[in-house]
């Protein structure tokens, strides 16, 4: 890749502007207008391409010769897609539990794939080791200012689509990159008064644990089926975010997240992974209504935006297996 074409690739964002549509079904459940930000239609399958694409483009401008990314799947696919666009070799380090379909997708993007450890944190150690090689750059799935800067583009799109600020933004938290990006975006567009409902599953609730403790907390293990939320420790930036905007942290059980995936499939005819189900459970499990009753959210919300963060770690067979495992009716 040479000359003007290379410069164009490095300048144009890799993410696409995604639809923001009101959901009749979820609005009926919530008793208020619910708008869905469909990040699951990103070309890399999730919102991750916003931040990671931006990061990789900046690293390419600085002369990076090889990218390496530890991932539960979604970040790796975003990094592999970005590397392929930039013509840079990439190594993706995944936990051994990663599905074969994700590995196939990564290899299809031309990535070298290494499977290491039980959870993401262990894969991340290997990625950091590889990043010490000359010319190699580690792509954090969530913990870098360029990642947050790229993810902030999502809020700029919300501002362009909505006439007025939403009553709340609902999102899932894993390592905290989406949360940090949304906070950055809200501050940028002057919507810092909009509360954020930050959803996690029990067993991957490192952000909730950190808020309760008032400091970063490392979970002993990731026991949730929502593997894409599986960072034992969130980014330190998330605690700062909770001071800059109103962030309401909520934890749901795996069963609630998986039931939300099934209901969303029935309602919207789209299949997302349990990590995304955690955000959808804010509506389906009545959490928004409870927060209103408790006075933590306004009793008269004009609308709510739920970020459908996407996900590549799911199939119809996996969903059925999860429903059986968790005894979901």
Curated annotation (Swiss-Prot):
InterPro entries: Ser/Thr_Dehydratase, TrpB-like_PALP, TrpB-like_PALP_sf. The keyword Acetylation applies. Its cofactor is pyridoxal 5'-phosphate. The modification N-acetylmethionine is found at residue 1. GO terms for biological process: lipid metabolic process. Monomer. Homodimer. Belongs to the serine/threonine dehydratase family. Catalyzes the pyridoxal-phosphate-dependent dehydrative deamination of L-threonine and L-serine to ammonia and alpha-ketobutyrate and pyruvate, respectively. Also exhibits racemase activity towards L-glutamate and D-glutamate. This is Serine dehydratase-like. The lineage of its organism: Eukaryota, Metazoa, Chordata, Craniata, Vertebrata. The gene is Sdsl.
């Amino acid at each position: 890749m040479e000359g003007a074409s290379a410069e164009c690739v490095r300048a144009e964002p890799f993410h696409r502007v995604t639809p923001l549509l009101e959901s009749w079904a979820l609005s009926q459940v919530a008793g208020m207008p619910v708008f869905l930000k469909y990040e699951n239609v990103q070309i890399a399958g999730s919102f991750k391409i916003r931040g990671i694409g931006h990061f990789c483009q900046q690293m390419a401008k600085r002369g990076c010769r090889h990218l390496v990314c530890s991932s539960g799947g979604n970040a790796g696919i975003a990094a592999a897609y970005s590397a392929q666009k930039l013509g840079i070799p990439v190594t993706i380090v995944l936990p051994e539990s990663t599905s074969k379909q994700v590995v196939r997708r990564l290899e299809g993007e031309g990535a070298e794939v290494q499977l290491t450890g039980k959870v993401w944190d262990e894969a991340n150690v290997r990625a950091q080791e590889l990043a010490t090689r000359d010319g190699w750059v580690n792509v954090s799935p969530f913990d870098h200012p360029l990642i947050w800067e790229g993810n902030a583009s999502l809020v700029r799109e919300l501002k362009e689509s909505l006439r007025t600020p939403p009553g709340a933004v609902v999102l899932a938290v894993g390592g905290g990159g989406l949360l940090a990006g949304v906070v950055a975006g809200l501050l940028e567009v002057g919507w810092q008064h909009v509360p954020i409902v930050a959803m996690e599953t029990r067993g991957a609730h490192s952000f909730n644990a950190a808020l309760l403790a008032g400091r970063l907390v490392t979970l002993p293990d990731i026991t949730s089926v929502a593997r894409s939320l599986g960072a034992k420790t969130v980014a330190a930036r998330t605690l700062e975010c909770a001071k800059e905007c109103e962030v309401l942290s909520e934890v749901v059980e795996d069963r609630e997240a998986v039931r939300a995936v099934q209901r969303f499939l029935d309602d919207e005819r789209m299949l997302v992974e349990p990590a995304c189900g955690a955000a959808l459970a804010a509506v389906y499990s009545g959490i928004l209504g409870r927060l209103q009753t408790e006075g933590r959210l306004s009793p008269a919300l004009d609308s709510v935006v739920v970020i459908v963060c996407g996900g590549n770690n799911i199939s119809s067979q996996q969903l059925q297996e999860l429903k059986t495992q968790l005894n979901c009716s």
